[in-house]
Amino acid sequence: MDFKLNGDTLTIYLEGEFNSYSAEPIENEIHKIIKANNFKKLVFDLEMLRYISSAGLRVFVKLKQQYDISITNASLEVYDIFQMTGFTSIMNIKKALRKIDLKHAEVIGNGFFSTVYRLDKDTIVKVFNRTSDPGQIERELRLAKEAFVSGIPTAISFDIVQIGDKLGVCFEMLDCMSLKTAVQTHLDRFQEYLNKYAALLKKINTTECLNPAIPDIKKFYYEKLEKIKPNLDDKHYLKAKQLLDSLEDRKTFVHGDCHFKNIMVQHDELLLIDMDTLSVGHPIFELATLYAPYCAFNEDDPGNSERFFGIKDEDASTLYNALLNIYFGKDDPVIKDKIRLVAYIHMVWWNHVNTPENKARLEGCRGRLYKLLDQYDDVNIGL
């Protein structure tokens, strides 16, 4: 019987059949492994287990009474036995992930954190590039469901899958494409798509969330500000904190990364597929986080939009400004400046966390942040 001790977690690998004939020797072997190791969490990996009977279940009951145990990689057949006998309500039991091959799949969208593929005519798969933690992905799916039941047009996943050493989620979506692709493919409908984009943002930012478990983005910005405090002088740090303090707390949704690669078009309806940054808070945070990919990254790294979006920097900036004009119903440079101010807090933080070696971007964003902090005493944008 194989096992692995990783930190304070002991994983034991079971295989074959766990029935009345094998239960006693398997139980004895489990106790030998347990006795020889120091651990806090006990995990049973059942990827190679074909069947479990009531005798095997009784062994798990006895172990549960003594240890903090969980079960992972249970096949569908084995998981069904756990579910029918009520074990899934008393133990943490995870099904084995379905494995899929994307060798011949078409890429229909990509970003910093994920890539979206069309698996077949009915199904798309979002593959996570920077996390292999199923718990983090399950958290995003819970956030997506919260948005969906609140009336936000959100694509709901039906399966978590494994692609090599990466994880992904499947969505049933017919005849869909990213909003980025739709805009580039149907230039004659640019204004129509832009109007729908602005309406989607408005819908998100005016929909109240009653679930206290959804994170508050303002608290996240306080954390960002504390993290970059060593990069700011005292005067501008205190001014930035004062302006964050002045923003009214809201319980309306903020997507947090709603650029047009994270939106799908299906039958002319816009649907969100990337929900890991969902939170509640003031709409200025929504518009500030959009300034980053459309404009801010280009300021110290020309050509960034070409590489990330496949469009010219000036076109990305034009799209963002046109989007704000529709959102507010006017072209107001003061409102845009105040949004930029909040955006540069995010940008200094992003650079500090992800590309600390990029001194030019840090100095550029910090300099523009200082200028706006000196210019404005509030971040009121009329919302």
Where are these regions (language model features)?
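ATP-binding pocket architecture of kinase catalytic cores
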Residues: 106-107, 112-212
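STAS-typified acidic loop motif
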Residues: 1-28
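Short, glycine/acidic-enriched loop or turn micro-motifs at the edges of active sites
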Residues: 18, 48, 162, 175, ...
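Active-site Asp-x-Gly
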Residues: 266-317
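Helix-rich C-terminal or lid/interface subdomains of diverse kinases
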Residues: 306-383
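Conserved N-terminal boundary motif of the eukaryotic protein kinase catalytic domain
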Residues: 99-107
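Amphipathic alpha-helical interaction surfaces in cytosolic regulatory modules
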Residues: 18-91
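An alpha-helical support segment within catalytic cores of ATP-dependent transferases
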Residues: 206-256, 260-261, 266-267
